[in-house]
Amino acid sequence: MPLRLVFMGTPDFAVPTLLALSAYGHDIAAVYSREPKPAGRGMKLQHSPVAQEAQRFGIPVLTPKTLKTDEALAEFRSHDADAAVVVAYGMILPQAILDAPRLGCYNLHGSLLPRWRGAAPLNRAIMAGDAESGVMVMKMDAGLDTGDVAMAERIAITDAMTVTDLHDSLARLGADLMVRAMAALERDQLQLTRQSEHGVTYAAKIDKAEAKIDFARPAQAVLRHIHGLSPFPGAWCELPIDGEAVRVKILRCASATGGGAPGQVLDDRLTIACQDGAIRVLQLQRAGKQPMQADEFLRGTPIAAGAVIV
């Protein structure tokens, strides 16, 4: 028998899971999402991607600023949910909320726990050079991503993969995984395993101060840095354009052969020397402009070999 669920999520990453659970036939009693925020040129208030999808399907949407009040708890309990599904909600759940659903609260997390607990697991996995990532369904407890694990799926991280690529792959995998987990819960067959205390790492929130590219690092580290921050906040450097140093985000790159002083442009294809080896820029973005392929950019704004990028 399908479950009665409360769904809690905010960004695009959570949308496939909401849609998959609804398509399976579960009763989505309510959707909780973060409050609307100003966005766009007019800075008008906009609901989150999850809230917009829920409204499209006529599912009640709640956007409380806190879940710690008696009123918020009473409202949450009023949904009489079998379970809550939490995907990138963006708010810590108090113990009283965790205890409210009959079968508990289940979180979809974008890492292979206990590695990369915390806010930015996708970015940190790429930036650290991890060979793989994945998604896990865990039963939530009061800790930070410390709950018992129910199911997991793994995916290889390639050199060409950006956070966007990993995000989209894990969002699809995660939706299927949560459907399977809720089906097992529905049949009282969901098995839980305690997380290991070994290999725990924390994925700190990305700070914009991390975004500047340091070409004095090894080429592989520079590539991972760029792809781990693409598209947001975007790893940046300053290109010499018309006699000025212009800040540009590099969104995609590839390993390249060649050597020179760190930051030196080695050819007319925007191959840049690093501490050892080089990278070739594939996609970049100037402030206020749309992303461009490097060859298209260079046709209008050539960067000569020998130039130095800082």
From Swiss-Prot:
Gene that specifies this protein: fmt
Pfam families: Formyl_trans_C, Formyl_trans_N
Protein family: Belongs to the Fmt family.
Entry GO CC: cytosol
Source organism: Rhodopseudomonas palustris (strain BisB5)
The UniProt record lists the keyword Transferase: yes
Annotated EC: 2.1.2.9
PROSITE patterns: GART
Catalytic activity: L-methionyl-tRNA(fMet) + (6R)-10-formyltetrahydrofolate = N-formyl-L-methionyl-tRNA(fMet) + (6S)-5,6,7,8-tetrahydrofolate + H(+)
GO MF term list: methionyl-tRNA formyltransferase activity
Free-text function comment from the UniProt entry: Attaches a formyl group to the free amino group of methionyl-tRNA(fMet). The formyl group appears to play a dual role in the initiator identity of N-formylmethionyl-tRNA by promoting its recognition by IF2 and preventing the misappropriation of this tRNA by the elongation apparatus.
Protein name per UniProt: Methionyl-tRNA formyltransferase
HAMAP family assigned to the protein according to its UniProt record, in alphabetical order: Formyl_trans
Transmembrane segments: none
Keywords: Protein biosynthesis, Transferase
Residues binding (6S)-5,6,7,8-tetrahydrofolate: 111-114
Domain of life the protein comes from: Bacteria
